[in-house]
Amino acid sequence: MAKVSMKNREQKREKLVAKYAAKRAELKAIIKNPNTSDDDRWDAQMKLQQLPRDSSPSRLRNRCQVTGRPHGVLRKFELSRIKLREYGMRGDVPGLTKASW
């Protein structure tokens, strides 16, 4: 189990990413536009750097919804490999069966 503070920190990051997504996309569009003047591009880069660090989507981490485990998380189920196996064996995940060939 991950510490509660780590789970809360991740939720805080998700909120910040959602809050600043439009602003970040707008600034990146200005920077990538080849018709933008150098001064405008420089201003956009400075504004982008002034945004909160945790508002960057690359700082997000996929975590297990049950335990908060950061490694071995399957995106489709949002569960760690351990919990997915446990739930699969109990029959809680529809369509998931143990392999046999």
From Swiss-Prot:
The task this protein performs is described as: Binds 16S rRNA, required for the assembly of 30S particles and may also be responsible for determining the conformation of the 16S rRNA at the A site.
**Matches recorded under HAMAP family:** Ribosomal_uS14_1
Which segments cross the bilayer?
Answer: none
Taxonomic superkingdom: Bacteria
The GO terms describing molecular function are:
rRNA binding; structural constituent of ribosome
Q: How does it assemble?
A: Part of the 30S ribosomal subunit. Contacts proteins S3 and S10.
Q: Which UniProt keywords apply?
A: Ribonucleoprotein, Ribosomal protein, RNA-binding, rRNA-binding
Organismal lineage = Bacteria, Pseudomonadati, Pseudomonadota, Gammaproteobacteria, Pseudomonadales
A GO cellular component annotation here is: small ribosomal subunit
The Gene Ontology biological process terms listed for this entry are:
translation
Entry's Pfam families?
Ribosomal_S14
Family, per the entry?
Answer: Belongs to the universal ribosomal protein uS14 family.
Protein's name in the database = Small ribosomal subunit protein uS14
